[in-house]
Swiss-Prot record:
Protein known as: Ribosomal RNA small subunit methyltransferase B
Pfam family, one: NusB
CDD domains documented for this protein: AdoMet_MTases (cd02440)
Location of the protein in the cell: Cytoplasm
PROSITE patterns: NOL1_NOP2_SUN, SAM_MT_RSMB_NOP
Function, as annotated: Specifically methylates the cytosine at position 967 (m5C967) of 16S rRNA.
GO CC list: cytosol
Enzyme Commission identifier(s): 2.1.1.176
Classification lineage: Bacteria, Pseudomonadati, Pseudomonadota, Gammaproteobacteria, Lysobacterales
Chief localization: cytoplasm
Disulfide bonds: none
Binding sites annotated in the UniProt record for S-adenosyl-L-methionine: 249-255, 272, 298, 317
Example GO molecular function: rRNA (cytosine-C5-)-methyltransferase activity
Broad EC category: transferase
Length: 431
């Protein structure tokens, strides 16, 4: 297969699985990318897939406008290939000759020599004409867009707009190995530029996304990839150096790792219901040379995992709609259904109640989600406080976003971070 063709073929296949079969983008990329030897080809596949999913309504509108007959249900890969071509011209700014040539050749490799002239004609039209204009919420399911508008009013447009933009690559420098300024110099020596955050002393925003193998010291645990909003959780919890700490929904392990980098003497229990995902926590701990007690269990089933000794602090990063991280997971909008929300709310409620039972009087529970839905955030928090007499909320402060009831909400893109909700709860020592 000639240069440039393979990544277009892979991207078309991945997009067909994600868009037409409801597969996870992360899962399909994890399976497909290792088939490409060149890291540049892998990066191109990722860039194409993300661009297509962010701009999918525009490309679908173009196909509707330009095709005399709509593509059939059996044409998923062909539809994906056309969108691969659109993304190269529209977002990635690949030179038109290279984009058309490689995409047309990919059509042959995919087994459609009789469709080559068709693909070429559609892409040449995309080169000549302006793509249709669609609303910023066009990719969002109607029920979800309406809920965002009801929750956020005039700020809803900012949420939709931010979710269409690529997210920066945030790094977390492990200060056990050196200071942030020194690491910036190492990045510069590797040809990379980064901007420090004023909110988190370990945080750096890269000027472009790169494979982790290009990050100095990554394999040795000197740096990790973690969004700014997620990095802020450690400071909000601020456990004492030898505290007993529970991370109740720990996978993939970034927040637990950050807490242990800051305080390696923590007695941290990392809990997750999924064995495969918990293995990622173990791999992360091994890479950064810290230790945690790992436990596969449902956090709500206390009899299955808790020995009855209270924790000093609990982190509950609850399962949620992921509406705050659409810019990183654009396929969320393809998969999310209205009927998904109530089960999520029930799980969050049960997790809050169970985790609270494990917390000692005077202890701290931090509840976070990567959602922008009030039902999962401030409404969930208010309901918990109403039924829990010994719980009180502390304001996390302005660094964590705008007030949202008794918590704080960062909207997507604010301070460069993902959409995140934060609440800090204290267990009353007098009750």
């Amino acid at each position: 297969m000639s240069d440039g063709i393979a990544p277009r073929v892979v991207a078309a296949r991945v997009l067909a699985l994600v868009v037409d079969q409801g597969r996870s983008l992360k899962t399909e990329l994890a399976a497909a990318l290792p088939t490409l030897e060149d890291v540049r080809d892998r990066a191109l596949v990722e860039a194409i897939c993300f661009a297509v999913l962010r701009r999918r309504p525009v490309y679908e509108a173009a196909l509707t406008r330009w095709l005399a007959r709509p593509l059939g249900r059996g044409d998923a890969q062909l539809r994906g290939l056309l969108m691969v071509g659109f993304a190269q011209l529209d977002v990635l700014k690949v030179p038109p000759y290279a984009a058309l040539s490689a995409t047309v050749d990919a059509c042959r490799v995919l087994g459609w020599p009789h469709r080559v002239s068709f693909v070429n004609a559609v892409l040449r039209r995309a080169q000549r004409e302006r793509l249709p204009v669609v609303s910023s919420d066009a990719a969002w399911p109607r029920w979800l867009a309406e809920r965002i508008r009801a929750d956020w009013g005039e700020q809803a447009e900012a949420i939709f707009d931010a979710s269409l933009k690529p997210a920066p690559m945030w790094l977390r420098v492990n200060l056990r190995y050196g200071d942030r300024h020194t690491y910036v110099q190492r990045l510069q020596a590797a040809g990379l530029e980064a901007v420090p955050s004023g909110l988190v002393p370990e945080a750096l925003a890269l000027d472009c996304s790169v494979p982790v193998v290009q990050l100095p010291g990554f394999q040795g645990g000197e740096v990790s990839v973690q969004d700014l909003s997620a990095q802020q959780v450690a400071a909000l919890l601020s456990p004492a150096p030898h505290a007993r700490l529970l991370d109740a929904c720990a996978a993939p392990g970034g927040k637990a790792a950050h807490l242990l980098e800051r305080a390696p003497t923590l007695c941290l229990t990392a809990l997750d219901v999924d064995m495969q995902r918990l293995r990622r926590v173990a791999e992360t701990c091994d890479r950064i040379h810290v230790k945690a007690r790992l436990c596969v269990a449902d956090a709500t089933d206390l009899a299955a995992w808790w020995d009855g000794e209270p924790f000093d602090a609990v982190l509950l990063d609850a399962p949620c709609s992921a509406t705050g991280v659409v810019r990183r997971q654009p396929d969320v909008l393809l998969h999310r259904r209205a009927e998904d929300l109530l089960p999520l709310l029930n799980i969050q409620s049960r997790l809050l109640d169970a985790c609270w039972r494990t917390l000692r009087p005077g202890g701290v529970l931090v509840y976070v989600t990567c959602s922008v839905l009030r039902a999962e955030n401030q409404t969930q928090l208010e309901a918990f406080l109403a039924r829990t007499a010994d719980a009180c909320a502390e304001d996390p402060g302005d660094a964590y976003g705008q007030p949202a009831g008794l918590g704080r909400q960062r909207l997507p893109g604010e301070q460069g971070g993902d959409g995140f909700f934060y609440a800090r709860l204290i267990k009353d020592i007098s009750m």
